[in-house]
Amino acid sequence: MKSKFKLTTAAAMLGLMVLAGGAQAQDKPREVLTGGHSVSAPQENRIYVMDSVFMHLTESRVHVYDYTNGKFLGMVPTAFNGHVQVSNDGKKIYTMTTYHERITRGKRSDVVEVWDADKLTFEKEISLPPKRVQGLNYDGLFRQTTDGKFIVLQNASPATSIGIVDVAKGDYVEDVTAAAGCWSVIPQPNRPRSFMTICGDGGLLTINLGEDGKVASQSRSKQMFSVKDDPIFIAPALDKDKAHFVSYYGNVYSADFSGDEVKVDGPWSLLNDEDKAKNWVPGGYNLVGLHRASGRMYVFMHPDGKEGTHKFPAAEIWVMDTKTKQRVARIPGRDALSMTIDQQRNLMLTLDGGNVNVYDISQPEPKLLRTIEGAAEASLQVQFHPVGGV
């Protein structure tokens, strides 16, 4: 009898708890998570750090920071070996990535994804042929035309071609097979739909797209450099109508695309006799940049260079005047591997794989403003949010 009373009492108490829980649930409506948020910093303060996370490459991501204070603003996932760029109008974030059905195996799907730049929310994906380049984050592997209408990307199957994507229509337009044997995409800022690529014969191929994104015309320059004797880095210091390339041995070659055909020039050397005696050479990934208003070019350099050190981090950053072809400043390199320049605000970002350094470059000698520490696990690319055109 006593045991029965206890069971009855327990059942009554449980019933009261359920009723109370129901009443409480009615008092507090269920929260619905819709995803996304509004990025707190203004667009002009944002920078994008492409984190390859080498130790778990299927989880690459883009970190967004406020460069003025180092605040973390958000993240965009980019799956396996992602690449990123921000649309020229600053409204969208474009990523290029690969998915496999079983993460590390299974059917492969290559896509370009479009994300809202203010909310960091996914909008759409554009299917690609399963041959987009899978490599480190060089700027020239994933670009867009100056008018912003087309994404231009590097393919490697391993045969090389360049893919054209119509962003508005969400279509893969075509393969530019004329770019076989050529590598990287260099948009020409003075033309709406033109770009160059570096070819295996030491020359440059220029492709002009029509309004439909198909090849309208093309031309090849004469040989600019010797692939065997003086190979160049694919990262250019890019002006409105000229591109400067540095070689593994510290020479500079230039390509002028102000006219109908590209005219190549060079080389001239970054090095004086003392530099040569110490074997100073360039090194890094996105290792050069140009401040267009002043004509100053920034190059990552290290001493004791030899075969195989072309990706060594910067011992120093050299500032070269491209008009006089003289060095005007040199500062500690802070082991940087990549850089980017903001033309409107006279700023430079450098990246050592994890930390981002912010410099004022309004004067010949760059001034370090701040360092954003631990910005990524393993990053080789950093970008400003576009402000005031390309």
Curated annotation (Swiss-Prot):
Give the EC number(s) under which this enzyme is classified.
Answer: 1.4.9.2
One Gene Ontology CC term in the entry = periplasmic space
Instruction: According to the UniProt record, list the residues that bear Pyrrolidone carboxylic acid.
Output: 26
Compartments (UniProt record): Periplasm
Activity regulation reads: Irreversibly inhibited by phenylhydrazine, hydroxylamine, semicarbazide, hydrazine and aminoguanidine. Reversibly inhibited by isonicotinic acid hydrazide (isoniazid) and isonicotinic acid 2-isopropyl hydrazide (iproniazid).
Q: Which SUPFAM superfamilies match?
A: YVTN repeat-like/Quinoprotein amine dehydrogenase
Q: Which reaction does it catalyse?
A: an aralkylamine + 2 oxidized [azurin] + H2O = an aromatic aldehyde + 2 reduced [azurin] + NH4(+) + 2 H(+)
Q: Which GO terms describe its molecular function?
A: aliphatic amine dehydrogenase activity; aralkylamine dehydrogenase (azurin) activity
Among its keywords, does the record have Disulfide bond? Answer: yes
Q: Which domain of life is it from?
A: Bacteria
Q: Which residues form the signal peptide?
A: 1-25
Which controlled-vocabulary keywords does the entry list?
A: Disulfide bond, Electron transport, Oxidoreductase, Periplasm, Pyrrolidone carboxylic acid, Signal, Transport
Any idea which positions bind substrate? 54, 57, 81
Q: Does the keyword Oxidoreductase apply?
A: yes
Which cystines does this chain contain? Answer: 182-199
Q: Which family does it belong to?
A: Belongs to the aromatic amine dehydrogenase heavy chain family.
**UniProt subunit comment:** Heterotetramer of two light and two heavy chains. Binds two azurin molecules per heterotetramer.
What job does this protein perform?
Answer: Oxidizes primary aromatic amines and, more slowly, some long-chain aliphatic amines, but not methylamine or ethylamine. Uses azurin as an electron acceptor to transfer electrons from the reduced tryptophylquinone cofactor.
Question: What's the name of the protein?
Answer: Aralkylamine dehydrogenase heavy chain
Q: Which organism is it from?
A: Alcaligenes faecalis
